[in-house]
């Protein structure tokens, strides 16, 4: 795994192989991550990354949020509950020297504390496939999102977004279905 673009382009991130089934890690491949950022930056959404406040739910290794920081996001918050994933996430933040621009929360992504003072403008949602956790996490964090914020959701089947969210695009990359939503 590596950072695909931006200021830290080419930076090698901590290795996890093809994923750790026991730790429920399924990192977004470089190819899919590149496609996601091409879609975000060239899909008619302006540039939702530059200057943005990013929330990476079910963050795993943090590759999506860190990619956003490399491409100009101002801040990234990561939510992860797994011990192995948290260790990799913290290591990757250190490799990027991004400690000052990040916050890491160890908690269940389906439960949200009160919203931060600065609303999130871009949310990455990459839950374990087929468990309905994405729907619950997005509903729990809806109050964190700025009006019109983009949500990029990875699943293996079409997700059911909470009421008020508008689906803008959906693309399949192998087993991964990427859905872009707009917050109300």
What are these regions (language model features)?
Residues 1-184:
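Class I S-adenosyl-L-methionine-dependent methyltransferase catalytic core
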């Amino acid at each position: 795994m590596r950072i695909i673009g931006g200021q830290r382009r080419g930076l090698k991130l901590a290795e996890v192989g093809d994923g750790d089934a026991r730790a429920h890690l399924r990192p977004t491949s470089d190819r899919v991550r590149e496609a996601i950022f091409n879609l975000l930056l060239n899909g008619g959404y302006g540039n939702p990354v530059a200057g943005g406040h990013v929330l990476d739910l079910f963050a795993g290794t943090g590759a999506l949020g860190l990619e956003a920081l490399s491409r100009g996001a101002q801040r990234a918050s990561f939510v992860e509950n797994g011990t192995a994933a948290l260790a990799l996430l913290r290591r990757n933040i250190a490799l990027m020297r991004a400690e000052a621009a990040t916050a890491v929360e160890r908690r269940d992504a389906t439960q949200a504390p009160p919203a931060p003072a600065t609303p999130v403008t871009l949310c990455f949602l990459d839950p374990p496939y087929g468990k309905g956790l994405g729907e619950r996490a997005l509903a729990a964090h809806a109050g964190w999102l700025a009006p019109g914020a983009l949500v990029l959701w990875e699943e293996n089947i079409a997700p059911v977004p909470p009421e008020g969210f508008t689906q803008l695009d959906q693309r399949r990359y192998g087993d991964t279905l990427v859905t872009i939503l707009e917050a109300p």
